[in-house]
Amino acid sequence: MEVITVEIKKMHFGLLTRKGKTEIRERELPKMGEFDVLIKQETCNICTTDYGQFLGLREHQGYPMAGGHEGSGIIKEVGSKVKGYNIGDRVALLYDACGRCDMCKSGQEGRCADADILDKFSEDGYKGFFGFADYMVVPSRRIAKINKELPSAEAGFLEPLATVVKGVKLVKAKPNETMVVIGAGTMGLLNALTLKAYGCKVILTESFENKIENAKSLG
């Protein structure tokens, strides 16, 4: 595999060392392969999995965890065999999938047989996606172009929104159908807004007053 030399040698990233304890660490930037891209991160949203592990509710995922996977940024370098992407493109991160197994080839990347990166250690002893970083090296299959006008924080929702759209397609939602969404957390709201965009009549259930008010503010 051809190795691409880049000027940037180090990356800084957020690391969850244990429940409620975070640190900023430095590591060598991984060497780029011919199908990889180097991204300068603009934003990385905090997913429920990240927050849950910070609170100690997902300690089974293990520590130290270099979390963050709902991000967006700007391409700074491309591998020699990367197609469709150029330096300066704004991109969002996608789900980490191998692209080779039967599930990936059938369009079910969310069920990838080799994507459980949370259970894998990097060569220097960390777990995770390294999204909470200034720079990332990722396979080009893990990114998608975004409009230049789209705010970076909104672009970071591409990965969870893709999950929602997949689910809406699986239930074959149709305009004017009544759909019930249980819970007005982040994913519940994304489901409700997506179903509304599909033309469905949405009933959203929630017991927490602050989440109810938040849902109302979004229409």
Give residue spans per PLM region.
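Short N-terminal strand-loop motif that marks the start
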Residues: M1-S72, D134
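Cofactor-binding loop segments of dinucleotide-utilizing enzymes, especially the Rossmann-like FAD-
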Residues: R18, E42, V78, A184, ...
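Glycine-rich beta-strand-centered segment in the early N-terminal region that forms part
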Residues: P30-C44, L57-K105, N147-E149
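Cysteine-cluster motifs in flexible loop/terminal segments that predominantly coordinate metals
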Residues: C47, L94-A144
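Glycine/charged-rich beta-loop-alpha catalytic/anionic-binding loops adjacent to active sites
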Residues: R142-S152
